[in-house]
Amino acid sequence: MAKQDSQTEGISIDSDLINFLNASPTAFHAIDEAKKRLKHSGYVQVSERDDWKLELGKRYFFTRNHSTIVAFAIGKKYVAGNGFYVVGAHTDSPCIKLKPVSKVTKSGYLEVGVQPYGGGLWHTWFDRDLAVAGRVIVREEKHGSVSYSHRLVRIEEPIMRVPTLAIHLDRNVNTDGFKVNTQSHLLPVLATSVKAELSKVVAENGTVGNDEETDGMKSSKGTTNANSKHHSLLLQMIAGQIGCNGSDICDFELQACDTQPSVIAGAAKEFIFSGRLDNLCMSFCSLKALIDATASDSHLENESGVRMVALFDHEEVGSDSAQGAGSPVMFDALSRITSTFNSDSKLLRKAIQKSFLVSADMAHALHPNYADKHEENHQPRMHGGLVIKHNANQRYATNSVTSFLFKEIASKHNLPVQDFVVRNDMPCGSTIGPILASGVGIRTVDVGAPQLSMHSIREMCAVDDVKYSYEHFKAFFEDFSHLDSKITVDM
């Protein structure tokens, strides 16, 4: 029997989401948090590098690049060729990431070279108290043997800031607009050169030096020291966080993070104010729904399919990576599970046609100050439940069949649901839905909880919609196989 997750027992779903968000400043940390929750709930980790030995009625997960995760529970009545019932979301959000050479010294300041990731509202990153988080590749030597590990790092205190230009030096900013040049304006300030020089850095060899003195240093094994690429002041903080010498840092993927924690807010405590709601809110709701829909052996007793959640990286930049939705990761998961029980390749093709994907990505709520940005008959409201997204040009993968099935689940469980199409005179965004629908051939509905300030450093959604999303996804896992048997489209 799966264990009750001690991390979430007795905690309201909105508070649990807050915990998830605050533990997940990056996609790497979100996957780490997801792994902890799955393991607490009896899920067993498998590796794509190994052969799989799967059993009916058991729960498993695997990760790719530690930024994508696929978790699944196999019904006790499953046979190869039966369907997969999947909720897919993504772990990444727009942010500013450190460049491979981030050391910038300019006008008496130490700045950090960054590049924008995704389509962020970059003006919202100005005048925020910023920290750094991500993953670091560390060299380890034990008993003369060298190995390398990846470690997650998070500096929680505010160490950087992107300051705006005073209005006295830009008199027309309020009339002409705040125009951000992401190459020259978006660099966070780390320290002044004078203070950095006074606050000397202890190098690995025991000498004391500043950035200029340690430039080009070599480690004991001859590799270029990271001080030649990054401010030693920053490296010292990273090394201190993960408990290694600065010279053992081989490489990293780091990003700037807002230090303000996620909160339940509003005069009626009805909102969640947070970064990365797009799309960690849907990632959390789908993950919790899967865990709770498979919490005991009895939940899988009469299940003839496989219940699955897939959380992908790199949606915000097109999904074309080894761990994005455009990669074979979804197809690989379906294929490996099916072939574990029967190697006949025809069964996978049958299974895909019996499968269903809920592509879950946050939706645009009607904005009270910009109501004209929504089509008059399609205005999703907060507290209105999940939004089903439609687009005639297939920017969303929803069709009448997939929309009907998802609405039927809502109707059975008395859950609200809404519809959305973008205005005809505005471009339409997209999701992992069309990518997986076309790449795998799986029936798909695109949905999402309504939110405001999408792609800002600080977004907002409604507490009620978190609850509705979780309940809708959980009902999908529990009811879909029975509901799907009642509709026939292709004979």
UniProtKB/Swiss-Prot annotation:
Classification of source organism:
Eukaryota, Viridiplantae, Streptophyta, Embryophyta, Tracheophyta
Name the record gives this protein: Probable aspartyl aminopeptidase
Per its UniProt record, what SUPFAM superfamilies does this chain match? Aminopeptidase/glucanase lid domain, Zn-dependent exopeptidases
Sites where the protein binds Zn(2+) 1: 90, 278, 361
One Gene Ontology MF term = zinc ion binding
Q: Which InterPro entries match?
A: Peptidase_M18, Peptidase_M18_dom2
Keyword Zinc on entry: yes
Subcellular locations according to the entry = Cytoplasm
Q: What is written in the cofactor note of this entry?
A: Binds 2 Zn(2+) ions per subunit.
- Which EC number(s) does UniProt give? 3.4.11.21
